[in-house]
Amino acid sequence: MIQITVVQIDNYGPWTVTPNPRRESDLQALQSRLYCDMNLQFGAHRGLAFYTRFDNIIAITNGIDLETHKRIQNSVKNRYPFTVSMAVASAETAYEAQKLATETIQEYGSAQDDVRKEVLDVANEFVSNGYVQLAHVDINDITGKLTDLETAYDTYLSVQMTKLKLMEELKKYDSMGFFIGGDNFMCPCNGMSEKDFLCMFEDIKESCGIDLKAGIGIGKTAEDASNLADIGLEVIREGKTDFQVYTLKQEIEERKDVTYNYMCPI
């Protein structure tokens, strides 16, 4: 089971134009700061957040309880000109968990409803014995094939096209994909096998002409899984395996509980 939290800014659209449209550079900076905060605060508890649309953030929160969610929510209220609503859900796959969390928030009203404020709810249950499976995917030799040859925008366009195709293919497995900078993607993919990834990469190569590789990490928390995925990707980059997918798994049952600070200093 994987636990997902959907974070949504309350009534954000109307706020950006009230009483007049706010300066775009300020809005972009504000959205980026919220994403930074969410990663720092969930990350302090071994979680991991993805910006998606900035006004909606998806986080992997295995091991993070309701009280910690409330503290993070209060921190946003105290330091930002808006509030956020949160819903938590768990499921066998990442896509299903975010679907349940999204539906829970939607039950309280529209994202632009001025009376819906600081929702905090749990769709089903908090995960105690679940696991997180993450794939760190990147493009083979993007520097030599794109960055050093094409314009910055054309390289960006190729990366975005690859991202879209990757996301579409992952959804077929009830998984998700998020761009994390450069030519890198982080993919919550509970239940997928190495064979699934190899087949998917072949389809993407045929449609986009892009070669991909992936380190897969399986761990108790998002931090554990992402660290293992990063190491797996380095194994491929360093030529220590002939395969384009490499998996590392944490001995979850042997992991000792560690006490973390409730809040990350910002």
From Swiss-Prot:
It catalyses: GTP + 3 H2O = 2-amino-5-formylamino-6-(5-phospho-D-ribosylamino)pyrimidin-4(3H)-one + 2 phosphate + 2 H(+). It comes from the Archaea. The keyword Hydrolase applies. It is an enzyme of class 3 (hydrolase). Coiled coil: none annotated. It holds the Pfam family GCH_III. Gene3D superfamilies: 3.30.70.270, Nucleotide cyclase (3.30.70.1230). Keywords: Hydrolase. Its EC number is 3.5.4.29. GO terms for biological process: biosynthetic process. GO terms for molecular function: GTP cyclohydrolase IIa activity. NCBIfam families: PRK02240.1. Catalyzes the formation of 2-amino-5-formylamino-6-ribofuranosylamino-4(3H)-pyrimidinone ribonucleotide monophosphate and inorganic phosphate from GTP. Also has an independent pyrophosphate phosphohydrolase activity. Belongs to the archaeal-type GTP cyclohydrolase family. PANTHER family: GTP CYCLOHYDROLASE III (PTHR42202:SF1). This is GTP cyclohydrolase III. The gene is gch3.
